[in-house]
């Protein structure tokens, strides 16, 4: 029978017990003896830590948003790279960008060790192959114009370190997200986001607080970058892709809220604009046809507010 432990080629120096994410949380040492009420209460109280951790990383998050926006505005793409929970969170955030912001599916991509199969069935062993991170990026034509966010809660994942090292090697933007102090694990990157959520209630289970903080950070990075790119007007997702009943309703409500357009007229405008809320707003507000409205948007880098400012009697 194959000795899987021998195959892993572990060494005494591989002990990860010093990492913050692997330490024992004294608040939960009697976790298995708690009542259901006490369990739920403890988890709710401990889940305040991700918010504190993300708030402490605001300076690095600002730097990352601005750098990502610059790259995307210049034609680059954003990649999330990770294994296990970290990789799945990247895939989740990337998958939400096209319906929310009508972005090209290639603009924001989630790269998970093990590929799509690892979304449903764990392939955690692949995270130990450092060269695989580089290989997965190369297969997607990752270039110096692009951005990489490497996600590794414990800061030691070889797959992620390999991807980040490759990004730095070719002068792409390399951003790291981890949940341990830099003195415990260094990562090759230009922007280092440390979300120090502390030991997990279930020791080592970084799908908990570390995962929550990571998801919050990814929400901030993608959403703020899209805001800076002009895909939002006020707090409305004016680049929403009206691809189902819920999103069509949202598009119609945006038209009503911003331009007092009733649902019948709104439907007509969306049909004429091929589902574009921005074009529909310009058509209605400025009395333009769809083609002219689209050209006006392009002239203003798809920034609705500046395009509206060119029109008389506009709502900007």
Curated annotation (Swiss-Prot):
Q: How does it assemble?
A: Homodimer.
Q: Which reaction does it catalyse?
A: N-acetyl-D-muramate 6-phosphate + H2O = N-acetyl-D-glucosamine 6-phosphate + (R)-lactate
Its UniProt pathway annotation is: Amino-sugar metabolism; N-acetylmuramate degradation
Q: Which domain of life is it from?
A: Bacteria
Q: Name one GO biological process term.
A: amino sugar catabolic process
The UniProt entry's coiled-coil ranges are none
EC number of the protein: 4.2.1.126
Which keywords has UniProt assigned to this entry? Carbohydrate metabolism, Lyase
According to the entry, every stretch annotated as the SIS domain falls at 68-231
A molecular function annotated in GO for this UniProt entry is: ether hydrolase activity
**Functional note:** Specifically catalyzes the cleavage of the D-lactyl ether substituent of MurNAc 6-phosphate, producing GlcNAc 6-phosphate and D-lactate.
Catalytic site: 96 (proton donor), 127
Q: Which family does it belong to?
A: Belongs to the GCKR-like family. MurNAc-6-P etherase subfamily.
Write the gene name. murQ
Q: What is noted besides the main data?
A: A lyase-type mechanism (elimination/hydration) is suggested for the cleavage of the lactyl ether bond of MurNAc 6-phosphate, with the formation of an alpha,beta-unsaturated aldehyde intermediate with (E)-stereochemistry, followed by the syn addition of water to give product.
Q: This protein is called what?
A: N-acetylmuramic acid 6-phosphate etherase
């Amino acid at each position: 029978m194959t000795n899987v432990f021998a195959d892993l080629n572990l060494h005494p120096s591989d002990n990860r017990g010093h990492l913050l994410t692997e330490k024992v949380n004294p608040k939960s040492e009697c976790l298995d003896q708690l009542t259901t009420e006490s369990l739920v209460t403890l988890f709710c109280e401990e889940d305040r830590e991700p918010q504190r951790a993300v708030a402490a990383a605001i300076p690095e998050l600002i730097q990352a948003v601005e750098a990502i926006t610059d790259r995307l505005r210049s034609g680059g793409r954003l990649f999330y790279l990770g294994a296990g929970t970290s990789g799945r969170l990247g895939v989740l955030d990337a998958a939400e960008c096209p319906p929310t912001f009508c972005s090209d599916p290639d603009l924001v991509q989630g790269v998970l060790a093990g590929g799509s199969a690892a979304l449903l069935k764990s392939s955690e062993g692949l995270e130990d192959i450092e060269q695989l991170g580089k290989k997965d990026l190369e297969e997607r034509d990752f270039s110096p114009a692009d951005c990489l966010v490497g996600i590794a809660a414990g800061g030691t994942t070889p797959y992620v370190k390999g991807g980040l090292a490759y990004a730095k090697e070719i002068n792409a933007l390399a951003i790291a997200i981890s949940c341990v102090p830099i003195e415990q694990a260094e990562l090759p990157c230009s922007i280092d986001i440390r979300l120090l959520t502390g030991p997990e209630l279930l020791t080592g289970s970084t799908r908990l607080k570390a995962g929550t903080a990571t998801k919050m950070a990814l929400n901030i990075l993608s959403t703020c970058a899209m805001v800076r790119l002009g895909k939002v007007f006020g707090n409305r997702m004016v680049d929403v892709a009206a691809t189902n009943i819920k999103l069509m309703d949202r598009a119609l409500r945006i038209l009503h809220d911003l331009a007092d357009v009733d649902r019948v007229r709104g439907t007509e405008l969306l049909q004429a604009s091929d589902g574009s809320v921005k074009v529909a707003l310009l058509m209605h507000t400025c009395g333009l046809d769809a083609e002219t409205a689209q050209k006006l948007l392009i002239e203003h880098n798809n920034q609705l507010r500046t395009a509206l400012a060119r029109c008389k009697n506009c709502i900007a």
